[in-house]
Structure formats: structure tokens, C-alpha cells
Amino acid sequence: EIASCLVGSEMCIRDRPIPVPGVMSAILISMDDKYLYLNNWLHGDMRQYDISDPHNPKLTGQVWMGGLLGKAPVINGVKIAGGPQMYQLSLDGKRMYVTTSLFSTWDNQFYPEIRTQGGAMIMIDCDVENGGMKINKDFIVDFGKEPNGPSRCHESRYPGGDCTSDIWL
């Protein structure tokens, strides 16, 4: 178990010489402008905030999917390596697809196990009525099992459109 403490907005991890920031590499607002999503690549969590009142955002969902804090889930026998990085939200806001590789050099530095294990894509079920997030335990794309792998996954696109690009039919 990794001991951690909070220093300001950064996490302090026993085996790291300095506080560890979350490293938010992306931010997303749902199509209905109700929810804001962000990732913390080093901490390992995805967050959902209700921004119906933009001056008073409320944390409504949080899931852990890797990261340096030792909270990596096992999904269908696959332990997640890396941290939440790129993500795509379906147009209805109910499904979020999250990948775990940011940049291979950084991946190797912070998550050396990703070299041999490979990356993954998971699906998070998002409650658009009440807020909340839950990792879908029936969905995983294990890029460690790819031919000529292990491979890493960075960005995906949602067929028919998604909330994070200007692609929709």
C-alpha cells in the first residue's frame, strides 16, 4: 500500500521525493452543458462535476483507474497500467471511453509496467440524471494482447460522433 497525503492540491507519495500533481491533460463538457469531466493522469482518477451552476461546481462522480496512488482496478482479469488520459464521451453522455497512455517517454518514467503490460481502454457508465460514474466491468480493450504488442492506446474516436470532437453525423 502506498502512503499518501494531501499538500495543497497535490498528492504526496512516500516513495516520491516531491509532491505529485494530478496532471490533467484534458477537460470535457457534456453536450447539455450539465457536466464537466476531467482526468488526473498521475493520481489515477476521472472526475465528473455538475456545473449547472457554474459558480458552484459539485463533484458528482469519481472513479479510479490506475495512477500512482495504487488504486488500479482489475477488469476481467486485466490490471490497469498507466492512468486515465484521453477520453471520449458519447453524444448522449452515458458512456465514456478512457485510454491510459499519455506519451511513451512519460509512460515509461511514471508507469514502467506499461512497457510489458500494454495500455487499456475502459468504459465508464455515466449517470446523466443524478450524476455519478461507474467503471463498466464487462468492457475492456487490452492493448497488451495486440499482435506484435504490447501496444499502448492514446486517442480513440467514437463512431457516429462524440462530445470531444467536431465529428458527428
Language model feature labels by segment:
Residues 32-34, 92-94:
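Short coil/turn segments that connect the beta-strands within blades of beta-propeller domains
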Residues 23, 83, 117, 146:
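Beta-rich catalytic cores
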Residues 9, 48-60, 111-113, 123-136:
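Short loop/turn segments immediately following beta-strands, especially the blade-tip
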Residues 1-8, 12-13, 25:
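Single conserved hydrophobic/aromatic residue that forms the stacking wall/gate
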Residues 41, 101:
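Short loop/turn segments immediately following the C-termini of beta-strands
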